Amino acid sequence: NSSSTLSDEYRLIPAGNPLKKPKIFQKRERGLEYNIYHHQEKFYILTNKNHHNFSIETCSKDSTGKENWKEFISGREDVLIEGLDVFEHYLVVSERNQGLLQLCVMNFKNDSFHYIPFNEPTYVVGTNSNLVMNTSILRYSYNSMINPGTMFEYNMETKKSKILKEKEVVGGYDKNEYASERVWADGRDGTKIPMSMVYKKGIKKDGNNPTLLYAYGSYGYSIDPTFSTNRLTLLDRGFVFVIAHIRGGEDMGRKWYENGKL
């Protein structure tokens, strides 16, 4: 595939005939972004063709031009679709809803779906390389402002997660000594701005705590609330660390990025 900021183009070569001339999936068009995912006799397409927050379309493997794309999951104003993982009997959709990442598991066998639950108010989650097609096991990574990176194995049939590996933090770190919150601040124009914060338990919430506020909004880059050992010394001295998910990133969807431009 060949991609630029505002367009994509894929070319297909059969795995069984690698010398065959590549076939263009959909010719490049300015403003048309898409990614493709092969499943049996069809493709799933993640695209901004019909919605700025992206939708999921399908087409047969023999008719791949955009005029043949059929809507599978429509675009939504409050949800940005970021990626797909395709399995034999499941489809996992990576979404960003109100700034928080979510994993939606769709079951082809009974046309049902569910979301993997996460118990913290602010966190980061993403799928790993899932290279086995015919399986009910999904691997994903999770971390938050108080939890170091953890890799999970999730059974999409039983809906159970199992820890495979958790990043070790040297120095006697105890995540139970810290707390995180997600709050909303009012912008000058009345827009609600999501903010992720972390602090050490036991501080007085009287407005007098030293605070380090971080914000970055540009190029559609979302600043996720990840774990960092660098801030632990501040938290242990009574600081509150805050990430403001300001406009310019895509935390709240494509318009959040567009509205951050001057």
Predicted features, each with a name:
Residues 24-46, 75-90, 122-141, 181, ...:
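Conserved beta-propeller blade repeats
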Residues 125-262:
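Serine-hydrolase catalytic core recognition
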